[in-house]
C-alpha cells in the first residue's frame, strides 16, 4: 500500500472508532498530545458528537476522565500516545475498576516490528493494566480487514460495560495525511462500502440489549426478613441509584437508617448520620447490639466502627444490595446478596416490621451529638472539622461536593451536620489514593457546570499540582479548599510507636503554602485562619465563574486533639 494510503486508512480507522464510541454512549473524550495517537487525535478533532478535553499530563488526564464518567454516568474515552504515557493512566484505571466506572483507553502503539528491538518510545502495552481493564488489541489498519470487524470488536467490548476497557491501537507510519479536507468517513470510499446502512443512521453497528441482573426476594422472604429488630445501612451509593428511596423504606419498615458519608444521605434529617460516633456512645451502642437483622445497600464503608459492628454482631439475617455482582464485605459475613440498584430494591413490596420503631431512642442520642458538635466544633476553635461543617451547612442547591481522601472524608463522616439541602457527594474510595483528587473534581465540575466544592488535604494537593492547569480552564464555580495542616496528620490518629518516628517517617512536614502555585496558574487565591474569613471567601468563590483556591491554615495537632476530646465526651455521654 502506498504511504499516503496508509495515513488515510489509519485516519479512517481512528474515525470509525470515535464514531462508534459516540454511538455507544460516550459523551467526552480526554486527550493528551502525542504523535503515535495521531489517527485518533485527528479523528477526535473532527468528531462533533464528543466534547474534547485536553491536558498535557496523562495521570491527571485519567483522573479527569474518571470525574467526567462519575458525573455523566456514561463511559469516557481517553486518548494517549505510546510508551509511559499509557502507564501514567494506571492509578485512575485502578480506581475506576474498583468502583465500576467505565473508562475507555485508546492508546496509540508502535507496530509489531518496532517492539522489543530498541525502537523509540516502544513498550509492551497490551495487558499493561493487568487485572484492572478488559483488553482489546487491534491490529495495524489493513485494507484487507473488513471495517465491520472493527465495529463489532468495539461493540462487544464496550456495550453495557461498567469497568475500564483498554483498546490498544497499533499504527504504522506515516501518521499524518498530507491534507485534512472533507469528511473522513466518506460514503464514497470503496473501503466503507459494506457500512452504507451504518453510515446513514446514528445507532451502533451491533445493538446489545441491556444486561439486567435484577434479583429480588419473594413476598414471603421479605415478610420473614422484617420480622425482628433490624437496621438499614446506606454505604457508597451513586446519585443515579436514587438513594432518597431508602428514607421511605426505613419509615415503612420501622428500622433506623444508618448512613455513610458516601451514601448521598449522610446529612438527611430522617437518617441517623452520626453512626460512627454513636457506636462509641455507650447507650446507643447497647441499643444497636439488640439488632439481629441488617439490610446493607452498597459497600465500601468509611467508619471502622461501623465495619466492626457488622463483623461482631450475631446476625440472624444479613442482606446486601449491590447493582452488580461484587464482593464488598471485608468481614466476610454470611449473607444473601441481591442484584438491584437501591431505588429498585426499596420499591419492592415491603411490610411493616413486627418490631417497628424499636430503635427510636437513637434519634435522641443523635440529637445529643448534634448539640455537642455545635458547642465544641461550630462554636469552638478554628479548625478542619469546623470548616467542613461550615461547607456542609452553607452549600447552595444543585451543588456538587468532592471530598478528598485521608482526613477530610473521615471528618465529614464523623461530624457532618444535619441539613435539608445537601449536595451530590463524590469520593475516590476504591483504592482510596491521595493522587488525582483535583483532576477528578475538575472532571465532575466540567460535565454540567454545576457549582462544585473540593475539600482536599495539603499532601493530596501537592500530589496533583499540575491539575491546576485543568482547573483554570473551567468556566463554572470550582472552589478548591485546601486544608493545610503541614503534612500527613492522619498519622496523628494512628498508633505509631513514638513522636519522632511519626514526624520523620509518616507526617513529613513540608512548610509549604499554595499561594505561588495558584498564581502560577492565574487562579484567585485566599488564605484564611478563622471562620469568618473562610465563610466570606467561600461565598464569594461560589459566585465566581471558574476555579479558585482557599487555603485553610491550621496547626498540625488541631484536628487530632479535637477528635480525641470529642471521643472522650461521647464515651462519657
Swiss-Prot record:
Pathway: Quinol/quinone metabolism; 1,4-dihydroxy-2-naphthoate biosynthesis; 1,4-dihydroxy-2-naphthoate from chorismate: step 2/7; Quinol/quinone metabolism; menaquinone biosynthesis. It catalyses: isochorismate + 2-oxoglutarate + H(+) = 5-enolpyruvoyl-6-hydroxy-2-succinyl-cyclohex-3-ene-1-carboxylate + CO2. GO terms for molecular function: 2-succinyl-5-enolpyruvyl-6-hydroxy-3-cyclohexene-1-carboxylic-acid synthase activity; magnesium ion binding; manganese ion binding; thiamine pyrophosphate binding. Binds 1 thiamine pyrophosphate per subunit. Keywords: Magnesium, Manganese, Menaquinone biosynthesis, Metal-binding, Thiamine pyrophosphate, Transferase. Coiled coil: none annotated. Its EC number is 2.2.1.9. GO terms for biological process: menaquinone biosynthetic process. Its cofactor is Mg(2+); Mn(2+); thiamine diphosphate. InterPro entries: DHS-like_NAD/FAD-binding_dom (IPR029035), MenaQ_synth_MenD (IPR004433), MenD_middle (IPR032264), THDP-binding (IPR029061), Thiamin_PyroP_enz_TPP-bd_dom (IPR012001), TPP_enzyme_TPP-bd (IPR011766). Homodimer. Belongs to the TPP enzyme family. MenD subfamily. Catalyzes the thiamine diphosphate-dependent decarboxylation of 2-oxoglutarate and the subsequent addition of the resulting succinic semialdehyde-thiamine pyrophosphate anion to isochorismate to yield 2-succinyl-5-enolpyruvyl-6-hydroxy-3-cyclohexene-1-carboxylate (SEPHCHC). This is 2-succinyl-5-enolpyruvyl-6-hydroxy-3-cyclohexene-1-carboxylate synthase. It comes from Shewanella sp. (strain ANA-3).
Amino acid at each position: 500500500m502506498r504511504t499516503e494510503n496508509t495515513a488515510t486508512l489509519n485516519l479512517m480507522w481512528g474515525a470509525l472508532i470515535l464514531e462508534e464510541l459516540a454511538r455507544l454512549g460516550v459523551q467526552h473524550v480526554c486527550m493528551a498530545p502525542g504523535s503515535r495517537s495521531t489517527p485518533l487525535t485527528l479523528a477526535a478533532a473532527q468528531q462533533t458528537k464528543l466534547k474534547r478535553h485536553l491536558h498535557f499530563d496523562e495521570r491527571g488526564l485519567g483522573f479527569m476522565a474518571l470525574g467526567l464518567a462519575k458525573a455523566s454516568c456514561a463511559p469516557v474515552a481517553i486518548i494517549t500516545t505510546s510508551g509511559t504515557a499509557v502507564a501514567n493512566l494506571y492509578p485512575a484505571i485502578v480506581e475506576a475498576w474498583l468502583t465500576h466506572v467505565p473508562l475507555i483507553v485508546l492508546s496509540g502503539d508502535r507496530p509489531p516490528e518496532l517492539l522489543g528491538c530498541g525502537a523509540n518510545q516502544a513498550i509492551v502495552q497490551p495487558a499493561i493494566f493487568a487485572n484492572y481493564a478488559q483488553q482489546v488489541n487491534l491490529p495495524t489498519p489493513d485494507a484487507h480487514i473488513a471495517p465491520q470487524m472493527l465495529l463489532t470488536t468495539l461493540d462487544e467490548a464496550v456495550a453495557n460495560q461498567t469497568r475500564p476497557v483498554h483498546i490498544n491501537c497499533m499504527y504504522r507510519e506515516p501518521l499524518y495525511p498530507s491534507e485534512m479536507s472533507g469528511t473522513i468517513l466518506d460514503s464514497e470510499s470503496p473501503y466503507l462500502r459494506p457500512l452504507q446502512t451504518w453510515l446513514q443512521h446514528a445507532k451502533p453497528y451491533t445493538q446489545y440489549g441491556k444486561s439486567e441482573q435484577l434479583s429480588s426476594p419473594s413476598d414471603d422472604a421479605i415478610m420473614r426478613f422484617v420480622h425482628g429488630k433490624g437496621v438499614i445501612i446506606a454505604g457508597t451509593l451513586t446519585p443515579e441509584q436514587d438513594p432518597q428511596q431508602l428514607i421511605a423504606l426505613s419509615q415503612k419498615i420501622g428500622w433506623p437508617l444508618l448512613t455513610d458519608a458516601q451514601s448521598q444521605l449522610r446529612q438527611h434529617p430522617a437518617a441517623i448520620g452520626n453512626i460512627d460516633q454513636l457506636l462509641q456512645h455507650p447507650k446507643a451502642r447497647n441499643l444497636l447490639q439488640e439488632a439481629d437483622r441488617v439490610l446493607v445497600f452498597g459497600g465500601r464503608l468509611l467508619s471502622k466502627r461501623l465495619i466492626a459492628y457488622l463483623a461482631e454482631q450475631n446476625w440472624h439475617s444479613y442482606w446486601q444490595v449491590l447493582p452488580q455482582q461484587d464482593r464488598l464485605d471485608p468481614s466476610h459475613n454470611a449473607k444473601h446478596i441481591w442484584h438491584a440498584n437501591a431505588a429498585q430494591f426499596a420499591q419492592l413490596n415491603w411490610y411493616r416490621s413486627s418490631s417497628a420503631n424499636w430503635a427510636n431512642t437513637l434519634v435522641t442520642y443523635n440529637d445529643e451529638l448534634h448539640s455537642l458538635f455545635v458547642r465544641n466544633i461550630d462554636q469552638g476553635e478554628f479548625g478542619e472539622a469546623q470548616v467542613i461543617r461550615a461547607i456542609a451547612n452553607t452549600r447552595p442547591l444543585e451543588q456538587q461536593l468532592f471530598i478528598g481522601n485521608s482526613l477530610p472524608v473521615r471528618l465529614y463522616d464523623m461530624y457532618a451536620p444535619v441539613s435539608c439541602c445537601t449536595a451530590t457527594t463524590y469520593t475516590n474510595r476504591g483504592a482510596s489514593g491521595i493522587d488525582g483528587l483535583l483532576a477528578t473534581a475538575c472532571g465532575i465540575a466540567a460535565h454540567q457546570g454545576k457549582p462544585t466544592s473540593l475539600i482536599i488535604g495539603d499532601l493530596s494537593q501537592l500530589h496533583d499540582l499540575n491539575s491546576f492547569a485543568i482547573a483554570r480552564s473551567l468556566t463554572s464555580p470550582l472552589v478548591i479548599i485546601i486544608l493545610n495542616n503541614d503534612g500527613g496528620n492522619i498519622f496523628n490518629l494512628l498508633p505509631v510507636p513514638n513522636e519522632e518516628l511519626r514526624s520523620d517517617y509518616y507526617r513529613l512536614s513540608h512548610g509549604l503554602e499554595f499561594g505561588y502555585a495558584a498564581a502560577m496558574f492565574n487562579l484567585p487565591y485566599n488564605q484564611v485562619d478563622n471562620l469568618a474569613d473562610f465563610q466570606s471567601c467561600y461565598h464569594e468563590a461560589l459566585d465566581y465563574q471558574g476555579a479558585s483556591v482557599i487555603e485553610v491554615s491550621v496547626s498540625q495537632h488541631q484536628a487530632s486533639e479535637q477528635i480525641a476530646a470529642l471521643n472522650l465526651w461521647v464515651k462519657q455521654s
